[in-house]
């Protein structure tokens, strides 16, 4: 029996299967932290969605499905320019729940299984777990708390404490569901479009 190398179609099928098995649900949300009047939140969400659409990163979802494709936006013609190059890009287009949500309602954005405690931006001292976790409830109920570092006594709003996998509360927010890693330049421009103070939440379930 002569073994021949697999054709390109089979290679793509294998890569797609490997991608589906290897990748769990994940998302990246870019959140505006500053509290804005509701009408300004809605207008900013409209403007940011318009920028994403006009640039070709997203387009209206023509395959809406409550279970498989629930987002109002789907990847647009230029989505590849927003992400890092990986071998399974073709598989991404066939992935369930790979849309984009532009959220107007103020809510908590949590990294779930990725959660790591924030550290002081000046001295690097890590917040005690219980202090960091308590700030989320305070943030939701009363507004963003200011925290003092126990080591260097510097104070900063919790959203300004560096955390690679931290949480955030705010609006509007843009969430990319199950996308490949976003390019830093794209994220920076999106943060500029949102304006003010922003936070990037990387969730994994």
Stretch-by-stretch model annotation:
Residues 7-113:
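N-terminal alpha-helical interaction blocks
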Residues 175-205:
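Long, contiguous alpha-helical scaffold regions
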């Amino acid at each position: 029996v002569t073994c021949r190398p697999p054709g390109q179609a089979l290679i793509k099928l294998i890569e797609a299967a490997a991608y589906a098995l290897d990748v769990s649900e994940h998302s990246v949300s870019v959140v505006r932290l500053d509290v804005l009047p509701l009408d300004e939140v809605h207008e900013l969400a409209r403007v940011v969605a318009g920028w994403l659409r006009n640039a070709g990163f997203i387009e209206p979802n023509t395959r809406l499905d409550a279970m498989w494709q629930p987002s109002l936006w789907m990847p647009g013609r230029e989505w590849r320019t927003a992400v890092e190059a990986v071998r399974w890009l073709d598989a991404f287009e066939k992935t369930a729940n790979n849309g984009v949500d532009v959220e107007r309602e103020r809510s908590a954005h949590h990294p779930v299984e990725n959660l790591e405690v924030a550290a002081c931006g000046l001295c690097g001292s890590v917040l005690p777990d219980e202090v960091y976790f308590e700030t989320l409830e305070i943030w939701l109920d009363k507004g963003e708390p200011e925290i003092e570092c126990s080591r260097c006594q510097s104070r900063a709003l919790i959203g300004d404490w560096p955390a690679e996998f931290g949480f955030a509360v705010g609006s509007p927010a843009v969430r990319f569901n199950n996308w490949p890693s976003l390019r830093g330049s794209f994220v920076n421009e999106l943060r500029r479009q949102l304006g003010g103070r922003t936070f990037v939440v990387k969730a994994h379930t």
